[in-house]
Amino acid sequence: MATAAQGPLSLLWGWLWSERFWLPENVSWADLEGPADGYGYPRGRHILSVFPLAAGIFFVRLLFERFIAKPCALCIGIEDSGPYQAQPNAILEKVFISITKYPDKKRLEGLSKQLDWNVRKIQCWFRHRRNQDKPPTLTKFCESMWRFTFYLCIFCYGIRFLWSSPWFWDIRQCWHNYPFQPLSSGLYHYYIMELAFYWSLMFSQFTDIKRKDFLIMFVHHLVTIGLISFSYINNMVRVGTLIMCLHDVSDFLLEAAKLANYAKYQRLCDTLFVIFSAVFMVTRLGIYPFWILNTTLFESWEIIGPYASWWLLNGLLLTLQLLHVIWSYLIARIALKALIRGKVSKDDRSDVESSSEEEDVTTCTKSPCDSSSSNGANRVNGHMGGSYWAEE
């Protein structure tokens, strides 16, 4: 029975690590056991070290947000308070939780008769209640400051490492003598740190502020983790370092623009957004397809030829390019709105509520509906926070 149980597992294990899938023709795992010096060649078991490192990165993030990001936010005037709290009302709360967060005209009129409130005041209550669930600016600032710090540090490390790497200056070096390209210490740490960070993002996105592009980001993290893992196991790490560095250069600029927006430094935010947009378009729609995809699809075919995992890796790279196109469209929409409004006010991929609703709430708090009702209900007063940036 034990043998029977082991049989399917052995077949599954053999299929997962099939040399026909992972490696070019006439190359076996045994060929990649050496050399003895340095880190040798990439091995699948190296990936296991990523998970404790990802947990460590998440723990460092908690400390960073608590003891560095939060004091910085308070120092520049970001308040440690959430949005206005809607006045308690059991009937409206039950409707909000159980029935709808956006009552139609008929329901509003029914609630108006039931509570002896005018319709405008009930609309105000629902708007306040929806915004009550929004995260405070302080939380968003801390999250962005952590990502900005990591992306900036890893980009500086990556560009310093690549500057002395021959494939940075001649991309065809990514495929010369492939797959017999031993790992250096710098390359190993660069790869493992990036992979651990994206694993930490994969788990933390379920506890972070929820964005409208949650599903897109989930796919992005899956594709990124898949790309880094696959390229490491089959030793396409040279081209992998170029891809990671290319993405990090615009990521930290986006986070910097969001930080300026949260801090209400509008002119700085606009400037950083313009720089980010230019860098994003050049790197994601220019350098990535015409330099990276060109070498993975055509130059690698010419030098080493296609094999099973080659097809999968290029499929993931093309999926990533599709995401680049989607994000470029969203960035273009923001830029168009910025030209019309005269400033960058909100990312189309931002939190659940829209900017138009925020404006309605601000108007609501200034309208006569804030006065007490005839049955002696407490006065509705408060304010709405300013515009806020989104998560990439």
Curated annotation (Swiss-Prot):
Keyword Transmembrane attached: yes
Bilayer disposition of the protein: Multi-pass membrane protein
Name the glycosylated positions: 26
Which stretches does UniProt call biased (Polar residues)?
362-378
Q: In which pathway does it act?
A: Lipid metabolism; sphingolipid metabolism
Cellular component annotations (GO), alphabetically ordered: endoplasmic reticulum membrane
Alphabetized SMART domains for the sequence: TLC (SM00724)
User: What would changing residue 26 to Q do, according to UniProt?
Assistant: Reduced N-glycosylation
Q: What is the effect of changing residue 254 to M?
A: Does not affect ceramide synthase activity
In short, the EC number is 2.3.1.291, 2.3.1.24
Per the record, ranges on the Cytoplasmic side are 332-392
Start and end residues of each stretch annotated as Disordered? 349-392
| Top-level lineage group | Eukaryota
A single GO molecular-function term is: sphingosine N-acyltransferase activity
Top enzyme class: transferase
Q: Report residue spans for region: Homeobox-like.
A: 75-136
GO biological process entries: ceramide biosynthetic process; oligodendrocyte development; sphingolipid biosynthetic process
Lumenal topological domain ranges are 1-46
Changing residue 254 to E: what effect? Strongly decreased ceramide synthase activity
Question: Which cell locations does it reside in?
Answer: Endoplasmic reticulum membrane
Modifications made to the protein after synthesis: Phosphorylated at the C-terminus by CK2.
Please report the stretch or stretches of sequence annotated as the TLC domain.
139-340
The record's annotation in PANTHER family points to: CERAMIDE SYNTHASE 5, LONGEVITY ASSURANCE FACTOR 1 LAG1
Note the subunit structure. Answer: Interacts with PAQR4; the interaction regulates the stability and activity of CERS5 and is inhibited in presence of ceramides.
Quoted from the entry, the domain comment is:
The last loop motif confers selectivity toward palmitoyl-CoA (hexadecanoyl-CoA; C16:0-CoA) as acyl donor.
What is this protein's record name?
Ceramide synthase 5
Q: Which organism is it from?
A: Homo sapiens (Human)
